[in-house]
Design a protein with these regions (language model features):
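Acidic, metal-coordinating catalytic segment for phosphate/diphosphate chemistry
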Residues: 1-22, 96
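Residues embedded in well-ordered beta-strands
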Residues: 16-18, 25-26, 105-107
Length: 161
């Protein structure tokens, strides 16, 4: 059995998106690749040469199917937030290259209708979606993301009604 030296692994740079509807609820998707009842906000990697803000718009569109014109950027975390994944997941994710993710979070006001959302995208990440309150979302995510979500809501929560 190989023992992973987590201290030698880096964090994967990533963006996260808080999509907020007119009622102040947050878009959450149920992970398609997870057998548990794990929900999360959209997030994804930053491509080579891409700014975090550009990546956020692209990932939001890729994961929710909404057009850029249906989301208005209204805030961002001041810095980067990171989380570690459980050691047993490291070999399964990102070819075992990373210990977790280092994320810049962006808040978007959703300007569209629910019918504008289409999670049946080219490479779907979610099997279903829902609008959730902060508390509902915090109670339905994987435990290792709770702390980073709390930090996101500490910085951007004032944008959620």
């Amino acid at each position: 059995m190989n023992v992973i030296d987590v201290s030698k692994l880096k964090y994967r740079k990533n963006v996260g998106m808080v999509l907020i509807n007119a009622k102040g609820h947050i878009f959450a998707g149920k992970r398609i690749d997870n057998n548990t009842d794990a929900w999360q906000m959209p997030q994804g990697g930053i491509d080579e040469g891409e700014t975090p803000e550009t990546a956020a718009f692209r990932e939001l569109s890729e994961e929710t199917g909404i057009h850029f014109s249906r989301a208005r950027l209204i805030g961002a975390t001041a810095g980067w937030l990171s989380y570690d994944i459980p050691v047993e997941l490291i070999p399964q994710l990102w070819n075992g290259q990373f210990r977790g993710q280092k994320q810049k979070w962006f808040a978007f006001e959703f300007l569209g209708k629910d019918s504008d959302i289409n999670i049946a995208t080219e490479e779907p990440e979610f099997s279903e979606w829902a609008w959730k309150s902060k508390n509902d979302l915090l109670s339905s995510i994987v435990p290792f993301k709770v702390e980073v979500y709390q930090k996101v809501f500490l910085e951007l929560g004032h944008l959620v009604k």
